């Protein structure tokens, strides 16, 4: 399980970029468009298996993982801390130098602490993950979603022929998708 510790400081698309794509000139729908930008980013992150933009997360594991441990949040930029909770409830933070971020977003721990780990929430890893730059393809995919959601605000489209935008969202993101191994 993982949870976000810090929120994005900015979205990968500016409000003005989305409004230009939507051909919206007034400020009446700015709050809605801002929410659509966030939702499109989150959908893109889910599809890609990558975080956009960089921020901090906690990964909580129920046992000591096998090494090297492939971090589920990509791309991993740094590992700030690794804290182990033992059976008696005490917490042991691994010291700097006993763990490291290796190639391919893998965490390497030289040695786990003495003692039996707790059977749930045994390891908490604090990691910074995310992209610094967003490729144009990713932005275009997000704009396609935003445009679709802005025009179709209900979950059912009645009275129209429904079809997928040819070569749309998935085609733009597919080359950079990370499939868990």
Residue ranges and their predicted role:
Residues 1-181:
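Divalent metal-cofactor coordination and adjacent catalytic microenvironments
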């Amino acid at each position: 399980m993982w949870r976000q510790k810090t929120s994005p400081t900015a979205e990968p698309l500016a409000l003005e970029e989305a409004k230009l794509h939507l051909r919206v000139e007034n400020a009446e729908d700015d709050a809605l468009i801002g929410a659509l930008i966030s939702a499109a980013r989150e959908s893109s992150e889910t599809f890609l298996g990558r975080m956009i933009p960089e921020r901090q997360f906690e990964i909580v594991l129920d046992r000591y993982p096998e090494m090297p441990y492939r971090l589920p949040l990509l791309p991993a930029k740094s590992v700030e801390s690794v804290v182990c909770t033992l059976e008696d409830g005490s917490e042991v933070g691994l010291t700097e130098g006993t763990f490291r971020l290796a190639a391919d977003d893998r965490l390497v721990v030289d040695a786990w602490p003495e003692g039996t780990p707790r059977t749930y929430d045994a390891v908490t890893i604090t990691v910074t993950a995310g992209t610094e730059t967003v490729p144009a393809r990713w932005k275009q995919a997000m704009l396609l979603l935003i445009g679709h959601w802005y025009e179709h605000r209900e979950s059912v489209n009645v009275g129209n022929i429904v079809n997928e935008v040819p070569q749309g969202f998935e085609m733009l993101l597919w080359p950079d998708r990370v499939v868990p191994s």
